[in-house]
Amino acid sequence: MKHLPKHLRPRWRYLAVELETWPDERIGRRSFQRELWYAGQNLLGDPGSADADLSVVRYAFADGRGEAIVKVRRGETDPARAALACLDEVDGAPVGVWVRGISGTIRAAEENYLRRRGQDSEERNVVFGNEERVAVRRDSVGDVRLDEAFVGATDLDYDLA
């Protein structure tokens, strides 16, 4: 079978996406892809979801933070951003999703939007609620571990032990 000429091939845009969740959660590529498809289908319907053709091309996730490159048909970037905004949890784990930028190539999306990572996280012992607890700190905010969950806090909410 012959290849299509360049002017007949579908054109793509690549969304650079940043993910954040609790430090002990693990979110896999397949789970993220499935939730993205469901969000697109629920928001855009079957025809709109097929037009956008959302698919995860690159994915990395560790220590509660992750990055993804989502491939979208040209002209469908706004519906794709809206579908990404509808994601609030993946596999039962709450997740924050930010579209860092849109590019015409995977390489440009990675270089321009995903390589500006903040500080790495560190574990510290803190006093929170009159008890010593473990907190995972990123920049000036921390996630304090309670019995079965985390609580988001800033440096003003706890004392370093």
Residue ranges of each PLM-predicted region?
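Surface-exposed, low-hydrophobicity interaction/linker segments
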Residues: 7, 12, 18-59
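Helix N-cap motif at beta-to-alpha junctions
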Residues: 71-77
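A common structural junction motif
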Residues: 40, 86-95
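C-terminal low-complexity, charged extensions that often adopt amphipathic alpha-helices
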Residues: 104-161
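The conserved glycine-aromatic submotif of the RRM
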Residues: 63-69
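Conserved beta-strand -> loop -> alpha-helix junction used to position metal-binding or nucleic-acid-contacting
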Residues: 93-108
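Hydrophobic side chains in well-ordered alpha-helices
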Residues: 80-83
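Short beta-strand/turn micro-motifs at beta-sheet edges
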Residues: 2-6
